[in-house]
Amino acid sequence: MYAVVASGGKQHRVAVGDVVDVELLSGEPGAAVNLPALLLVDGESVTHDADALASVAVTAEVVGVVKGPKIRIHKFKNKTGYHKRQGHRQKLTRLKVTGIETGKA
């Protein structure tokens, strides 16, 4: 069973036990986080109805904060000798998915 969840404007395919890096979330390591499910695949059935997904709970545990890949920016203006080099590394939150609970009894 796996689910597609939304976090930070992006979508991630997760299953129980997966470790995923998402945009920075507030929370200390060890804190529990609930993620909204957009799609649920359970064996042969696929659920994408918003009403049915309201009862689906995807829980994850904050593992820590990591840095993303280095992005290099270079600005250049012609005929002036102007060069500007800059770098950036986005902070990401590493989550470990602990459970995907459906509302079925």
Curated annotation (Swiss-Prot):
PROSITE patterns the record matches: RIBOSOMAL_L21 (PS01169)
A GO CC term attached to the entry: ribosome
GO biological process annotation, one example: translation
GO MF assignments: rRNA binding; structural constituent of ribosome
Annotated keywords: Ribonucleoprotein, Ribosomal protein, RNA-binding, rRNA-binding
Stored InterPro entries: bL21-like (IPR028909), bL21-like_sf (IPR036164), Ribosomal_bL21 (IPR001787), Ribosomal_bL21_CS (IPR018258)
Domain of life of the native organism: Bacteria
A Pfam family reported for this protein in Swiss-Prot or TrEMBL: Ribosomal_L21p
NCBIfam families: L21
Family to which the UniProt record says this protein belongs: Belongs to the bacterial ribosomal protein bL21 family.
UniProt function note: This protein binds to 23S rRNA in the presence of protein L20.
Subunit structure: Part of the 50S ribosomal subunit. Contacts protein L20.
Protein name: Large ribosomal subunit protein bL21
Species of provenance: Frankia casuarinae (strain DSM 45818 / CECT 9043 / HFP020203 / CcI3)
Lineage: Bacteria, Bacillati, Actinomycetota, Actinomycetes, Frankiales
Designated gene of the protein: rplU
